[in-house]
Amino acid sequence: MDQFGDILEGEVDHSFFDSDFEEGKKCETNSVFDKQNDDPKERIDKDTKNVNSNTGMQTTENYLTEKGNERNVKFPPEHPVENDVTQTVSSFSLPASSRSKKLCDVTTGLKIHVSIPNRIPKIVKEGEDDYYTDGEESSDDGKKYHVKSKSAKPSTNVKKSIRKKYCKVSSSSSSSLSSSSSGSGTDCLDAGSDSHLSDSSPSSKSSKKHVSGITLLSPKHKYKSGIKSTETQPSSTTPKCGHYPEESEDTVTDVSPLSTPDISPLQSFELGIANDQKVKIKKQENVSQEIYEDVEDLKNNSKYLKAAKKGKEKHEPDVSSKSSSVLDSSLDHRHKQKVLHDTMDLNHLLKAFLQLDKKGPQKHHFDQPSVAPGKNYSFTREEVRQIDRENQRLLKELSRQAEKPGSKSTIPRSADHPPKLYHSALNRQKEQQRIERENLALLKRLEAVKPTVGMKRSEQLMDYHRNMGYLNSSPLSRRARSTLGQYSPLRASRTSSATSGLSCRSERSAVDPSSGHPRRRPKPPNVRTAWL
């Protein structure tokens, strides 16, 4: 604090020198606030006027003007000019230590472009060299007068360059919303720097608030205002637009087609590709039609070409231009003829190949026997001819058999069926064949059977009555019955029409009373069973 106090005690009061600058700033701010309610078009034009007037004070050298123009392209033109003015004022009014702190705060708190701190220290060093001299008042007064006199000369050039840059920036902001949004971010940074540096000069607060209000517009408002200002430049009566009609026309032509399209660039690119593909497909479809149309054109124009050639031979020096056109047309027709002949040749070749594929094998077989050696020592010529005839006859028969579709289809079917059978099918076939063989054996046996003797009903009734007569007639009938019973069990068992009494007697006689088992006796030789 003691250091700052010592410096402030030896400091000269610059209120007299600052009063002129503050009065100029107040006049500018009053003019701005009086016309805030005007249209946005006029407001933007007035802002550009103020910018141009302030740049006249700023630019002291040609190098500095070029750097300022580059910075105006990167940022909107209203704000950096006022930043530079306020920084120069603060550099004159503050001591070295406070100035260095202020510059450090500005560079760290606000991310300003690199070109700003390179430009400010030059002005600061000039102020320091002239600040602590013997004639302080005269040096400061002369310096300000020198700055004003220098700024009066390049002001016109600066106005032109800034006007061009401003038009370019407005057109670029209207072309894409992304660039306008990035521009709005830089505007906010510049507005913050203005509000931070305005503590040293309180008279410039009102003008800076107005400028920051303009810069804090949304991207859409900027887009609209930029278009309106560029469109109304030719009709306005401001001296700047009147002095540069060519630039205003250029800006109108640049901005007029920048309305937002209905189709995105990717979709339009895809549509263009699709249209190109359609055109290619149509060209490919019309190739054959064009070829045949060219044939007709050649036929129709052949007479004209002949006449043109004759006329050319007669009037070569007189008709040079006509002959050149006829030559061009004849060359085109020759080229088309060549293409047509090539296509026709290809068609003929394809047809010939197809015919050879169909008829080639037969011709090949028939042509081979004709190619024979000139001399054959094993056979005479007559024998060789007979052999050739026989071979040709055999080849014809083989070719006929090969041409028949039935012969090819039947042979592989008979050969292919057995291996396709599965084991289950084979087992079924074997079982079926075995059953068929047994049935055939039984059928043969049944066919070989003959009717047995005495199996008729009349014969059995006669036997029954005869046996009954034997039993009733004599006492020795029991023996006879027993003997008859021994021979008659087979008959009684086989006849279903016999009576129950006879069957009971035959069964009793056949059963042994001691053992209870039937006694089997040898069969008579004349009796035969049906199943043997």
UniProtKB/Swiss-Prot annotation:
Residues 28-83, 116-263, 306-333, 398-421, 485-532 are annotated as: Disordered. Residues 50-63, 227-239, 253-263, 493-503 have a biased composition (Polar residues). Keywords: Coiled coil, Phosphoprotein. InterPro entries: Cfap97/Hemingway, Hmw/CFAP97. The modification Phosphothreonine is found at T133. Residues 127-139 have a biased composition (Acidic residues). Residues 170-185, 194-205, 320-329 have a biased composition (Low complexity). Residues 35-49, 67-82 have a biased composition (Basic and acidic residues). Residues 374-450 form a coiled coil. The modification Phosphoserine is found at S19, S138, S139, S218, S248, S330. PANTHER family: CILIA- AND FLAGELLA-ASSOCIATED PROTEIN 97, CILIA- AND FLAGELLA-ASSOCIATED PROTEIN 97-RELATED. Belongs to the CFAP97 family. This is Cilia- and flagella-associated protein 97. The gene is CFAP97.
